[in-house]
């Protein structure tokens, strides 16, 4: 089933929860509509964020929580106003607008967010017109993007560790049991005559 999570008391939500704030998983909560529930890492198959991301203050934290809550292979389905649309900034509650490059930190530069084991991959991306029909970029009012939670590869984790401030080996790199230490050359003999 679906669980409608929102931060606004006036929204018709199942659970009032601010995913831009620190959260500890598993999270036990009591919903007025579904009763006691537990939210935990790797639990969700799909998260839908329809016209949400442009409103949140701490988008990296919200995206981190979405990544944590999704199963590997789970989808984050996003619909946001397109930055270049004439209507993008008409809502005074928007704190950002999105474009094609808005997803790079979550897909390609994931280590900037402290992610190492999982990241997002763009599964699909397209544009919608003001009536929410598929449209070419020139007539776009919205973007619709589906991000897929994927495991990072060993190469990606090595790159991520290299790009991070503290360099560490990923957990799946074998630790050498013997260290190679070259022999020190013997001291040169000096001949005294």
For the regions a protein language model found, what residue spans apply to each?
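Conserved SAM-binding loop
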Residues: 1-84
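S-adenosyl-L-methionine-dependent methyltransferase catalytic module, highlighting the catalytic core
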Residues: 57-61, 65-67, 71, 75-193
């Amino acid at each position: 089933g679906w669980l409608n999570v929102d931060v606004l008391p006036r929204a018709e939500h199942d659970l009032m929860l601010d995913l831009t704030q620190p959260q500890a998983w598993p999270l036990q909560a009591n919903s007025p509509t579904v009763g006691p529930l537990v939210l935990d890492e790797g639990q969700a198959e799909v998260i839908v964020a329809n016209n949400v991301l442009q409103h949140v203050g701490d988008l990296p934290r919200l995206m981190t929580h979405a990544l944590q809550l999704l199963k590997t292979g789970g989808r984050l389905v996003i619909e946001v106003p397109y930055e270049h649309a004439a209507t993008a900034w008409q809502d005074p509650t928007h704190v950002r607008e999105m474009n094609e490059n808005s997803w790079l930190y979550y897909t390609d530069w994931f280590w900037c967010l402290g992610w190492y084991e999982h990241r997002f991959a763009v599964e699909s991306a397209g544009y919608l017109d003001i009536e929410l029909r598929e449209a070419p970029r020139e007539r776009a009012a919205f973007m619709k993007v589906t991000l897929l939670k994927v495991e990072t590869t060993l190469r990606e984790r090595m790159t991520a560790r290299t790009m991070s401030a503290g360099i560490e080996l990923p957990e799946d790199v074998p630790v050498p049991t013997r260290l190679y230490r070259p022999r020190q050359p013997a001291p040169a003999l000096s001949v005294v005559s």
